[in-house]
Regions:
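Glycine- and hydrophobic-rich flexible loops that cap the catalytic core of alpha/beta enzyme folds
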Residues: 2-261
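A cross-family structural signal marking well-folded subdomains
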Residues: 178, 184, 205-400
Length: 400
């Protein structure tokens, strides 16, 4: 790891770098309040000639960097860096000083190369990149109502409705102080993830789903990150919904770590241990999660199961708030759906009847007793002590 104090103009400027916002990072989320706070800080710096401190910018080099250009994958500071570039684009688009316009465009926003991969100095996240490139290229007719465009327009309005000296504002931005932190992890990507966890622990709290996504998508290859994101993670989120990721991973782990149980608040730590102890590749885990998510969507009603009998009983289980059954249902769906569908119908109906009777004697919290029953059945199925059929499940429930 290497840390250096720098001016932002040294960090962004030059002809040998492209900044990459990886898919494991949040999308661009700065709102008007964030932008106005930065704007006021920059105006104060311009008026007082005191450099504004922008904070740390943490990154690591991609192994796919070319001979002429280095790809720097951002771990922290991407929201601030993106916003600074939006302000620079707004200055470029409102100044009448052609020298300043060209200086900003050619040294801070774009690279003078034919290779499209390196043309724009910042590659925003996959969902933001088109809007960001349109702003940098001046294709304003192509812009939608993205957050990037909203903030760009805010800065345009500030510049066109005031008597701000464009050159002085640019100088204030260029003079901003940062700490440039190059993680230099080589192949030790655990360092990247550890730093990510620590720097984000002081900001907006990340969900277990955020942390797991970051863990699975972190790579020293931008190409692999994008493949993992678009071919696996996005599809998982589409199947079950972003807000359901933590409980989905929890139920997945109840299967993978059976018979061990753990608190839902420990899901990220248990996931890291599972990835390490079972010696699974990230691609293998993503593929398995995608497979399970195709069934889990029925359990959270993101999509109604095409089998009407199963769908009816799933609705009853959901109505009874029996989420403790989800891990067992997920395992049953994964092993039986489309192969033993008639038998699965019978078992899901059995579970719906069981939980209804269970609610007559227990409250809706489920509790350790129900979790224990479910855990024992999962464990016996995995160990092949019982089979995936109605009679075996009935016997286990009857003797619980």
């Amino acid at each position: 790891m290497r840390a250096q104090e720098k001016k932002i103009k040294e960090f962004i400027g030059g002809l040998d770098k492209v900044f990459i916002i990886p898919p494991f990072q949040r999308h661009y989320v700065w709102d008007e309040k964030n932008c106005l706070e930065l704007w006021d800080d920059l105006i104060n710096s311009m008026n007082t000639s005191v450099a504004h401190y922008l904070g740390n910018i943490i990154y690591y080099p991609s192994k796919e960097s070319g001979a002429a250009y280095t790809e720097l994958i951002l771990v922290d500071g991407q929201q601030r860096l993106t916003t600074i570039l939006l302000i620079l684009a707004a200055i470029r688009d409102t100044t009448t000083d052609e020298n300043l316009k060209n200086d900003i465009n050619n040294k801070y926003l774009k690279n003078d190369v034919r290779n499209e991969k390196y043309r724009i100095r910042l590659k925003a996240g996959l969902e933001d990149n088109e809007s960001f490139e349109n702003i940098i290229d001046g294709n304003l007719d192509s812009l939608n109502d993205s957050n990037l465009f909203t903030n760009y327009n805010l800065f345009l309005a500030k510049l066109t409705t005031s008597n701000i000296n464009h050159q002085k504002l640019f100088d204030a931005i260029a003079n901003c102080d940062i700490v440039d932190i190059n993680l230099q992890p080589d192949d030790n990507l655990l360092l990247v993830q550890t730093v990510f966890e620590k720097i984000n622990s002081t900001g907006k709290e990340l969900t277990a789903g955020d942390l797991i996504r970051n863990l699975l998508l972190t790579s020293n290859s931008v190409e692999i990150q994008n493949i993992f994101y678009s071919e696996y993670w996005v599809k998982i989120e589409d199947n079950i919904g972003v807000d359901k990721i933590p409980e989905f991973i929890y139920d997945y782990l109840l299967i993978k770590l059976s018979p061990h149980r753990f608190k839902k608040t420990d899901v990220y730590d248990r996931f890291k241990e599972c990835l390490k102890n079972k010696d699974l590749s990230k691609k293998e885990v993503l593929a398995e999660l995608l497979m399970y998510s195709k069934h889990y969507k029925y359990l959270v009603e993101k999509e109604i199961c095409p089998n009407e009998k199963i769908a009816k009983n799933i609705r009853e289980i959901i109505m009874l708030k029996a989420t403790d059954l989800n891990a067992l249902l997920l395992l049953l769906f994964n092993e039986m759906y489309q192969r033993q569908e008639t038998e699965l119908e019978k078992i899901v109906s059995l579970l719906a009847d069981f939980i209804l009777r269970y609610r007559f004697v227990k409250d809706y919290s489920g509790g350790d007793a129900l979790q224990s029953v479910v855990g024992q059945i999962i464990n016996k199925l995995i160990k092949e002590e019982i089979t995936y059929n109605y009679n075996d499940i009935l016997f286990e429930l009857s003797n619980s």
